Amino acid sequence: CIRDRCPPQPLNDVTTVVFAGDHGIASNGVSAYPTDVSVQMASNIESGGAAVSVLAKRAGTSVRVIDVSLNSGSEADTHICDGSGSIDREDAMSRDEYRRALQVGIDAADREIDSGVDLLIAGDLGIGNTTPAAALIGALTNTEPVVVVGRGTGIDDNGWKRKTAAIRDAMYRVHNIHDEPASVLQFISSPDITAMVGFLAQAAVRRTPVILDGIVMCAAALVAEKLAPGAKQWWVAGHRSVEPAQKIALRELELTPVVDLGMRLGEGSGAVVTLMIVNAAVDIIRNMATFDEAGVSTAADAEDSGAEDSPAEAPGAEE
C-alpha cells in the first residue's frame, strides 16, 4: 500500500516532473527529429498542448518542466548548460556540472515533497536521450551494445546503425569502470539524466513513491539504485516501453511494469496513464465492499446449505 498505509490514502496531490535536456550525440543522426524539437516541446508541455499535458489533466496531476540542459540559453538556476557532450567521443559533462545537475534533481524532489505531494511522476524530454539511456543500461549491466539499441523516435535502419555505433563507442569509453556508477553517469549520460538520478534517490530518502516512465527514467533509476541501495522500494514501474534496454533495466531492478501498451513517447506519458490505474486501485481498496459487508452469499454459505439439505442417515444403516 502507498506509503505504508493500508487502506491507502487518496492521491489528491500528484506532480509530474519532466526533466529536459539536449544531447550532443544527436548530431550523429541518432534521432528522426532535429534537436530544436526539444525546446519546442518543452514549451508545448507548459502551454498544455503535449500528450503528457492532456493525459495529466485527465489523471489529475500537475506538470512541471525543468530545463536542465536544453539548448535554450536559459539563466534559470536549474539550467546547468546548453546541451551535453557527444558521449561517443567526449564526456557528457564536467565534474562540476555533474554535481550541480545531481543537486537540481535533489532540490526538485525536496520542493515537491515539502509542498505536500502524495506521489511523484518522473518524465523525460530531449531529442537523442534514448542513446545515453541505452548506453548507461548497457554499461551498468554488461550487455552488448547491439542488444540495448532501440528505434527511439522511429529511426530507419541507417539511423539504427549510427545509433548502435554511438552506443558502442560510448560504452567502450567506460568499459573499465563499470563498478563506478557515478563516473559512468558523468561520462556517458547527460545533465538532465543526472538530475533524474538525484530526484529518484531523494524521493526514496523522503519516503515518497514515484511512478517511473520509460527507458530514460529507468536508466536513471538503475544508477540511483546503485548510488542509494534500496531506493527502488519506493518506485513503481509505470509501463513497458518498446525500447529493449528498458526491459533489461527493469529486470535488473526487479520491477514489473503495470501496463504494456507499446508506448514510446516519453514525457512521463506512460507513467501518467499508470496513475489512472493506481487511482482506480486505491478507490477499490478503500471503497469496495466485501461480500460480508454487502450481505452477499459466499462459497462457505453454499457448503453450509448443502450440508443442511443432506438427508439424515437411517439409524443402524451400517452394522
Predicted regions and their residues:
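Active-site cofactor/substrate anionic-group-binding motifs, chiefly glycine-
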Residues: 10-73
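Glycine-rich, mobile lid/loop segments that gate access to catalytic sites or pores
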Residues: 81-130, 135-141, 152-156
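Short glycine/serine/threonine-rich phosphate/pyrophosphate-binding segments
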Residues: 26-28, 122, 127-134, 193-197, ...
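Conserved small/polar residues in nucleotide/adenosyl-binding loops
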Residues: 1-4
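Hydrophobic alpha-helical bundle architecture
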Residues: 198-237, 256-263
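Internal helix-turn-beta structural module
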Residues: 243-292
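A glycine- and small-aliphatic-rich helix-loop capping segment at beta-alpha/alpha-beta transitions
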Residues: 33-39, 135-147, 227-233, 280-281
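Phosphate/pyrophosphate-binding betaalpha-module
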Residues: 120, 131-195
